[in-house]
Curated annotation (Swiss-Prot):
Signal peptide: none annotated. This is Sterol O-acyltransferase 2. Polyubiquitinated by AMFR/gp78 at Cys-281, leading to its degradation when the lipid levels are low. Association with AMFR/gp78 is mediated via interaction with INSIG1. High concentration of cholesterol and fatty acid results in Cys-281 oxidation, preventing ubiquitination at the same site, resulting in protein stabilization. Oxidized at Cys-281: high concentration of cholesterol and fatty acid induce reactive oxygen species, which oxidizes Cys-281, preventing ubiquitination at the same site, and resulting in protein stabilization. Keywords: Acyltransferase, Cholesterol metabolism, Endoplasmic reticulum, Lipid metabolism, Membrane, Oxidation, Steroid metabolism, Sterol metabolism, Thioester bond, Transferase, Transmembrane, Transmembrane helix, Ubl conjugation. Residues 1-37, 75-96 are annotated as: Disordered.
Length: 526
């Protein structure tokens, strides 16, 4: 037996040339020259493990701190919580308890996280390169046809015509939304005798009726009377719908607590500053407080506004190069099924481009810019809708801001009113409200009624929502979802462009109701 227990012996191995050579090795399975490397690698992996655990604990601690802070902020200011009502005393003035409530936390938008990955930034660079190609092609065509290098923005200038008038119209809309709902809430919350309170409540309802009249009638009157172009109409209709949804959310969230406060349950009325902040922050769900970021990154704000402007220019180039030359004279040619099908297929590419540009410009750039200026912490305005394998998931993740409003005030309140068994009816109600709102926006912006969006959203979209449900997974379903999106966008762009030019080539000799609601592109082929 040799001392030390580690005998050094010679081991014969074959070299590359078949020769045998002697190598020293110790007892065991690990070679001497590999042992230090293995120890270093083990220590490195242990350090990585400790670092990951520390980061995960920090994030979890931050999440729990934020949740606890929100719970403290929402706790009543009295020394003891308000008494719980008995189970049989639930009234319509109390909030429904069905479903989950929206919780706001500090988080970044998904695209901001993906932009940190170089591979995804390359896709972003490809879209910028596409814009450069459109600019180069426009310059080249103008130089060949007219012998000059000049970018013309006729379509952009036409679309945003009379924008100052739209901005002036926005002022009374905003003031009505700022003053009427809050003053109505104060009148309802005022203590006093029953007769005095009834008079104040009636005055509050009159204020809300005047507010609704201003929001519904004023923008429509200005748009029709002054023949505003599409982009200026967009400003009015988006603000009209936004103010209506925010007013409803404020009243829906604040009225139950206000009525309980009148009964002496110790609940404070909402502050005017919180309501003013809510009117500008990028959410449609009212809360007294929201998680806030510590500072404002003005370079991030400028970057998002610049990207939104770039998307507007991109959309103008797409319409001017891919849509206007195809559809401008289509109504002057004889109708044929072949021409209609080819026009729809031709419009799929510009249609999906327009969808992506609207998503990126509004749901990412515009909302993030305002969120940053207001230090609004929750930036989850959308989720990964592009990975959806069902249309039900696509509808939930495409526009989280609007989905939260529909879920809270249409679906959940529908279940509260009709019972938990009426989930199908509540879901149909969500589709009906959303489809009518989308069709109204299209009708307002384009200046004519052509229910393409209503049929696609309510009928086709509703069927696909139940047929392509969440149980379908896998890449094939994602491909099918994208195929349906391509075709749907092609149908919208093709039919709406045909109707736009048909109403200009074939004006009505006499304005009638049926002439206004009947598609002109079906009969205008001169």
């Amino acid at each position: 037996m040799e001392p030390g227990g580690a005998r050094l012996r010679l081991q014969r191995t074959e070299g590359p040339g078949g020769e045998r050579e002697h190598q020293p090795c110790r007892d065991g399975n690990t070679e001497t020259h590999r042992a230090p490397d293995l120890v270093k690698w083990t220590r490195h992996m242990e350090a990585v493990k400790a670092q990951l655990l520390e980061q995960a604990q920090g994030q979890l601690r931050e999440l729990l701190d934020r949740a606890m802070w929100e719970a403290i902020q929402s706790y009543p200011s009295q020394d003891k919580p308000p008494p719980l009502p008995p189970p049989d005393s639930l009234s319509r003035t109390q909030e429904p308890s069905l479903g989950k409530q929206k919780v706001f936390i500090i988080r970044k938008s998904l695209l901001d996280e993906l932009m940190e990955v170089q591979h995804f930034r390359t896709i972003y660079h490809m879209f910028i390169a596409g814009l450069c190609v459109f600019i180069i092609s426009t310059l080249a065509i103008d130089f060949i046809d007219e012998g000059r290098l000049l970018l013309e923005f006729d379509l952009l200038i036409f679309s945003f015509g009379q924008l100052p008038l739209a901005l002036v119209t926005w002022v009374p809309m905003f003031l009505s939304t700022l003053l009427a709902p809050y003053q109505a809430l104060r009148l309802w919350a005022r203590p006093g005798a029953r007769g005095t309170w009834t008079l104040g409540a009636g005055l509050g309802c009159a204020l809300l009726a005047a507010h609704a009249l201003v929001l519904c009638a004023l923008p429509v009157h200005v748009a029709v009377e002054h023949q505003l172009p599409p982009a200026s109409r967009c400003v009015l209709v988006f603000e009209q719908v936004r103010f209506l949804m925010k007013s409803y959310s404020f009243l829906r969230e604040a009225v139950p607590g206000t009525l309980r406060a009148r009964r002496g349950e110790g609940i404070q009325a909402p502050s005017f500053s919180s309501y003013l902040y809510f009117l500008f922050c990028p959410t449609l769900i009212y809360r007294e407080t929201y998680p806030r970021t510590p500072y404002i990154r003005w370079n991030y704000v400028a970057k998002n506004f610049a990207q939104a402007l770039g998307c507007v220019l991109y959309a103008c180039f797409i319409l001017g190069r891919l849509c206007v030359p195809v559809f401008a004279n289509m109504s002057r040619e004889p109708f044929s099924t072949r021409a209609l099908v080819l026009s729809i297929l031709h419009a799929t590419l510009p249609g999906i481009f327009m969808l992506l540009l609207i998503f990126f410009a509004f749901l990412h750039c515009w909302l993030n810019a305002f969120a940053e200026m207001l230090r609004f912490g929750d930036r989850m305005f959308y989720r990964d809708w592009w990975n959806s394998t069902s249309f039900s998931n696509y509808y939930r993740t495409w526009n989280v801001v609007v989905h939260d409003w529909l879920y809270s005030y249409v679906y959940q309140d529908g279940l509260w009113l009709l019972g938990a068994q009426a989930r199908g009816v509540a879901m149909l109600g969500v589709f009906l409200v959303s489809a009518v709102a989308h069709e109204y926006i299209f009708c307002f912006v384009l200046g004519f009624f052509y229910p393409v969006m209503l049929i696609l959203f309510l009928v086709i979209g509703g069927m696909l929502n139940f047929m392509m449900h969440d149980q379908h997974t896998g890449p094939a379903w994602n491909v099918l979802m994208w195929t349906m999106l391509f075709l749907g966008q092609g149908i919208q762009v093709s039919l709406y462009c045909q109707e736009w030019y048909a109403r200009r080539h074939c004006p009505l000799p006499q304005t009638t109701f049926w002439g206004l609601v009947t598609p002109r592109s079906w009969s205008c082929h001169t």
